[in-house]
Amino acid sequence: DVDNKVNQRDDFHHVNQVIANTLHEFQWVFIGAYPLSLTPYVQSGQIEFHPWQRLYEYPEQLYKLNPTVLIAPLQDNIFNRAKSDLKYIEACCYGIPVICQDICTYENAPYRFTTGDELIDQIRAVTKSYSKYNKISKEGREVAETRWLELDQNIDKYAELYKHPYKSPERKNINSLEENQ
């Protein structure tokens, strides 16, 4: 969106109210865009906002912001069900716990929510203890390293993804991962 705002029925629509209600408890930060309904909070400085960055600048920006948790809300619709779980994988690579919408896009994410209240409960659960938080961060990083990063042991998995259609019996490496979950 040209003005860095997203429309009224955005992916945050079902969590906007709990974000507004928890401004006293959490520091909310948006990168790239923010929901129109939260504009007064952005303008007053109650919600921190950072404009879009070039793709290669994004990891450094995220590092400097040092987020505690990332969230990935999505409306449950055909378009979003067809998306990849890139936000989950990205957060795992950074070692940042991520709480994702409970739709098929994020079926591999261990922390998911359906409602805004569930999102807040999940944030509290992830951040309530330093040792639990570190364990979650480490587990996410291990997911990234063992399943997604371009390591030698993953090259065959990537080749299968490009050569064979979804659920094909020829996808031996990928299918074995799904069976072991």
Identify the function of each model-found stretch:
Residues 168-181:
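Non-catalytic membrane-proximal stalk/linker segments that position and tether the catalytic domains
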